[in-house]
Amino acid sequence: MQGDFTNLLIEEKECVTWQSIARKVPRNVMSFAARLSTNSLASPDNLRRWGKRKMGICPLCASPNATLAHITNMCTVALNQGRFTWRHDSVLLQIASTVKSLATGETEVFSDLPSFQVNGTTIPADILVSTGEGSKPDLVILDRKRKIIALLELTCSLPGSAFKAHIMKDKKYTELALDLEAKGFQVFIVPFEVLSPGHITKQCKDSIQNTLQLFNIRVKKTLYENLGKIALLCTMSVFHAYQVKEWVSPPLLAP
């Protein structure tokens, strides 16, 4: 447990939103966040380790080792039911709506959300017709006149797997980027991570900021606070529902 606490301190130092969130959420939410980061919530695996259960089985998928990471990010049943997608899309809605509201001039903004798509996708057909894996980034920012396009892809990952997710998402859109470059566009692939405990690293924030500046879009730091807060609240909801067999995704969460 000491190692978990040390990791929490390191993450807090590197996270641009953690301390801001701490001042703006109820005490019970911050308590949940601290226990989440130190692996001291009552997951099936922890209950087994604490001697309160004989087995640490996941109530949803029957995995024999239902760790906290499994419950909040890895359970296949929870994934297929849309629990993790609800968190992802809630975070995505916040950044997409903010960026779209600030876009000016020739800048267009599309996102893989119903009210932000163009003909069911995120890249206009007159720019490029592309289907299949790696054809629909989460967020697309486009300036036709300057021939610049940014492909942003969100992951709400565990702290320890953020780098792996970043590399995987970067590779996912390589072919799409090449097709767009063949059309004369300057392409920026921007994977970014809002971690499930609500952390956003300075590196991630800087990457988003630098991308938005290409389109003369400037966001306030409250955007990152809101992204972290939404991720944390969604993770809290996912955790508290892990013993509920059925899931109907509620409306996307707002800060």
Outline where the language-model segments fall.
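A short acidic/basic microdomain associated with nuclease active sites
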Residues: 37-50, 99-132
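Short, flexible/disordered secondary-structure transition segments
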Residues: 44, 68-72, 102-109, 180-188
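Glycine- and acidic
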Residues: 18, 76-80, 153-159
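Non-catalytic C-terminal interaction segments of nucleic acid-processing enzymes
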Residues: 1, 83, 114-140, 145-146, ...
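Short Cys/His-based metal-binding microdomains
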Residues: 49-99, 149
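Helix/loop segments that flank and initiate small ligand/metal-binding modules
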Residues: 1-65, 90
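Amphipathic alpha-helical interaction motifs in eukaryotic regulatory proteins
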Residues: 34, 38, 76, 92, ...
